[in-house]
Design a protein with these regions (language model features):
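Extended, folded cores of ATP/NTP-driven motor/assembly subunits in large transport
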Residues: 1-406
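P-loop NTPase motor domains
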Residues: 64-76, 371-429, 435, 476-701, ...
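P-loop NTPase motor core of the ASCE superfamily
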Residues: 128-131, 433, 512-567, 711-840
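Walker A (P-loop) phosphate-binding loop of P-loop NTPases
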Residues: 450
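Conserved lysine of the Walker
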Residues: 453
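Hydrophobic positions on the alpha1 helix immediately C-terminal to the Walker A/P-loop
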Residues: 456
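Post-Walker A helix-loop "phosphate-sensing" segment adjacent to the P-loop in P-loop NTPases
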Residues: 462-472, 487
Length: 840
């Protein structure tokens, strides 16, 4: 009996027809994760293992050697090796870590950190200040699929060859997360969980069946693939370039030469896969060459055959002394819509086909279902007839294949995200001067006028202040006065305040070595006083007299008497000499002359109030301090002495530095301290800076000087080399004298790296560039900030004047910055309250 007589209901046949479909999951390779093998079992009975590497900005020698070592490993027959770079728009982990580091509970600091993170997060779809280049994280994956289990020995060989590229095994959940994002939406994170064990007696579905979600479209239409609310296109080379160079390969994923090539960047997420097959023998190469050479052809077919003959000829040149592999390069771009995907594909095609050494590139359509899976880990099925029918592979020597590998992306810095920059290709750069892998935390900055130095350093000081560091800046010119005000810091004008800077204050020295170092510095300071007007060198006898006088002053507890105590010892020499051997009759007039030369620095002298009595410069409780020396430039006899005393006093504080609250010392405009005339000796002044670098290295502080040219280090004499050796990081901004610095053996750059350095530019007001050379990497970074942070960091005279005018008109510093940046102060305070609530 029918439930509805006479009504034709849904039949099983119609029901089955409604649910029958082609499942793209059938193309995906992964069946199950086998924990014992740390590998995926794949649909073709292969075993897949994956790693993540740290991509390099450029093809440095150690990178190419690592790749050559990898490609020369004797893998089993039928092995497929894939190197895959993914321009990942998901930068939230780095931004979250950046915010977690900004622990100082100050409304302005927290607002700047939040707005920086939001600005860069929004930049994943393109930053206007960078000509719409998106901010991203280039990730590099290595996938190896073998017909037999890879085994511990081969796995160890792979990891040893790539150790210098930061290789790590990729957990299965991370790889599955990447797969899910490709198919379901690259802009959002995806879970990595998957079923691997049977439940309720039912076997777990294959991993391939757990990747693609039911909701988003998955449709192949001509040259487009609609997947995960995004549109993808694929490009492959129809013919390779006649030859490949490292620089040419670098440009396959975007220009690297600066603003002139900003339009040569792929404006969204993309994936570049180089699949390497190890099955083709040299016999097959020679056989194909003979067939092609014997062909007679005309018209367009002749052109095609000619290109293939040229390709084979290039290969045969290497055949006698190099291993050969087959490679399949594929480039996928992912747009938010068809228009963006089309524009991205056109730009990628232009990059590959540009001179010199152009490739012939085609957009794929019919083969898209196969090529999509083949461009993902383990998704290329190396059955010989299939590869032959696919016709997308090229044979080349492993040296050429290593250059084609997508390992050159962009400079990425290194360490925790204490500082955030953006690379020329959009890489989010993280940098930490206090990274534990670096053997010292010191730095040098070099920048000619107008290169963006003050903005860069204001930003650097603000970022470290935000994470709890103590900031000490010695400056000439007031570049940090506004920042000091905004950070509720202490601004000390040395020429205006009646401070006592007693060079014999040894209270912070922690051990005998520190005390002797402090005494040696005090001797250099007093020697500078004794020759203040001439800056001439002192003789060995003069040095030893001063050293004996200062040792007596300290040992006898007369340190608070300052220069008066030294003059007393010198004037009565040899009465207080330590032994008969220290009494030299002909040095009596020398000692009295030294005492006479120090008269201006005694308590009754013109400058005596600076150096006699207990020290009153106590900044140990201050979080942010600027010591301004501008007023003293008009007193040349005093200027160098004050510089030495101030540098010495500030760097002695490094004895108190701690890992959780490091001290950060910056000496700006150091070259102005080192002005020199014929016959003058600047070694004593240079030694003050050298001591700063040594103390910072010993006590895990950070000490840095700012120069207008790296050649200024020659003014420091032998101490210049000490500074270079004790400064792990260099910030080199736009300059015109780097060639000369190389000639002077100050910089050890040549060729490509030197050209890269000389390409650094300040593109104000959009961004400024800086060449960073650190133990964690070398390359060019761009400082680009949101409007609110811009007004915190700027030191341009007209913009500082606008800020000061608002403060004089009654705004507090935070309100002044908000008004200039067009931000409601209530938003800043409300945001800070919300953050405080979360912290609670």
């Amino acid at each position: 009996m029918s439930a509805r007589p006479g009504h034709k209901g849904l039949s099983y046949q119609r029901l089955r027809a409604a649910v029958t479909r082609d499942a793209y999951s059938d193309f995906l390779p992964m069946v199950a994760w086998v924990e014992e093998e740390e590998a995926f079992l794949c649909i073709d009975d292969g075993w897949g293992q994956a790693w993540e590497l740290v991509p390099s900005a450029y093809m440095f020698a150690h990178v190419q050697q690592a790749l050559l070592g990898l490609l020369n490993i004797h893998f089993p027959e039928g092995t497929v090796l894939q190197l895959i770079t993914f321009a990942d728009p998901l930068i939230d982990p780095a931004l979250d870590a950046y915010l977690d580091m900004k622990v100082r509970p100050d409304p302005l600091v927290q607002a700047s950190a939040r707005r920086t993170a939001d600005y860069l997060r929004g930049g994943t779809r393109g930053l206007d200040a960078l000509h719409a280049i998106p901010v991203r994280d280039f990730r590099l994956f290595l996938a190896i699929k073998t017909r037999v289990k890879l085994g511990a020995d081969l796995r160890r060989q792979v990891e040893e060859q790539l150790a210098k590229m930061g290789i790590r095994r990729l957990p299965p959940d991370e790889l599955i997360s990447v797969y899910r994002r490709i198919f379901n939406g690259v802009f959002a994170p995806a879970p990595g969980v998957f079923l691997s064990e049977s439940m309720g007696g039912m076997p777990a579905p294959s991993i391939a069946r757990q990747i693609i979600e039911a909701g988003p479209d998955l449709c192949f239409e001509g040259p487009e693939v609609f997947l995960g609310n995004q549109v993808a296109r694929c490009l492959t080379p129809k013919a390779p370039a006649r030859r490949i160079t490292a620089e040419r390969a670098n440009r396959l994923m975007g220009g690297m030469r600066g603003s002139a090539e900003d339009s040569d960047q792929i404006g969204g997420p993309f994936l570049y896969c180089l699949s390497v097959l190890f099955d083709h023998s040299q016999f097959e190469i020679h056989k194909r060459a003979q067939i092609l050479s014997a062909q007679k052809a005309a018209g367009s077919f002749a052109v095609e055959v000619g290109k293939q003959i040229e390709e084979i000829g290039w290969i045969l040149d290497e055949a006698s002394n190099s291993r050969f592999v087959s490679v399949i390069p594929t480039m996928w771009v992912f747009g938010r819509d068809s228009a963006q995907a089309r524009e991205m594909a056109a730009r990628a095609k232009r990059l590959w086909e540009s001179e010199p050494l152009p490739f012939m590139v085609q957009e794929e359509s019919y083969l898209l279902p196969v090529l999509l899976a083949a461009s993902l880990p383990f998704g290329l099925y190396p059955e010989k007839q299939t590869i032959k029918l696919l016709e997308r592979d090229f044979r080349m020597a492993v040296k050429a294949a290593s250059l084609m590998a997508p390992v050159q992306t962009d400079f990425r810095g290194g360490g925790r995200p204490a500082l955030l920059y953006v690379g020329r290709k959009g890489q989010l750069i993280t940098l930490d001067l206090f990274d534990p892998r670096i053997n010292n935390y010191n730095f040098i900055v070099s920048a000619e006028s107008g290169a963006g130095k003050s903005f860069l350093l204001n930003n650097l000081c603000q970022q470290y202040y935000a994470q709890g560091a103590l900031i000490r800046i010695i400056d000439i010119g007031g570049s940090y006065r506004k920042l000091c005000t905004l950070c509720s810091g202490r601004y000390i004008d040395i020429g205006e305040e009646r401070l006592v800077l007693n060079p014999f204050d040894m209270g912070l020295a922690l051990d005998g070595e520190d005390k002797q170092s402090a005494i040696a510095m005090a001797v250099a300071i007093v020697a500078e006083m004794a020759n203040a007007s001439t800056r001439k060198p002192v003789t060995t006898s003069e040095w030893n007299l001063l050293k004996s006088a200062i040792q007596w002053t300290v040992d006898s507890g007369r340190g608070d008497d300052g220069i008066d105590a030294v003059r007393h010892w010198l004037g009565r020499y040899p009465d207080n000499a330590a032994s008969d051997l220290d009494r030299v009759d002909h040095l009596v007039p020398v000692a009295r002359e030294l005492a006479f030369n120090l008269r201006d620095f005694g308590s009754q002298g013109a400058y005596g109030h600076f150096f006699n009595g207990p020290s009153t410069l106590d900044i140990s409780r201050d979080e942010f301090v600027v010591l301004e020396l501008e007023r003293l430039k008009a007193l040349p006899d005093l200027f160098n002495v004050i510089v030495m005393v101030v540098v010495n006093a500030v760097t002695q504080e490094l004895y108190l530095s701690a890992r959780d609250k490091p001290r950060f010392v910056l000496c700006d405009e150091a070259a102005q301290f080192m002005t020199r005339s014929d016959g003058q000796d600047l070694s004593r002044l240079a030694e003050a800076f050298g001591q700063g670098y040594r103390r910072a290295r010993k006590y895990q502080g950070s000490f840095g000087i700012v120069l207008q040219s790296m050649n200024d280090l020659m003014l420091f004499g032998g101490t210049g080399q000490v500074i270079l050796e004790n400064a792990a990081t260099k910030f080199l901004l736009q300059g015109s004298t780097y060639d000369k610095a190389v000639d002077n053996k100050i910089l050890d750059y040549s060729g490509f790296v030197l050209d890269l350095l000389k390409s650094v530019r300040n593109a104000k007001p959009n961004y400024s560039e800086v060449f960073i050379d650190s133990p964690l990497g070398l390359g060019i970074a761009r400082l680009v900030v949101d409007p609110f942070s811009y007004w915190i960091n700027t030191s341009a005279p007209n913009e500082v004047a606008a800020f000061e005018a608002l403060v004089r008109a009654g705004r507090n510093p935070l309100e002044a910055v908000c008004e200039l940046a067009g931000v409601d102060p209530a938003q800043i305070l409300a945001g800070n309250c919300r953050q405080g609530g979360r912290a609670a």
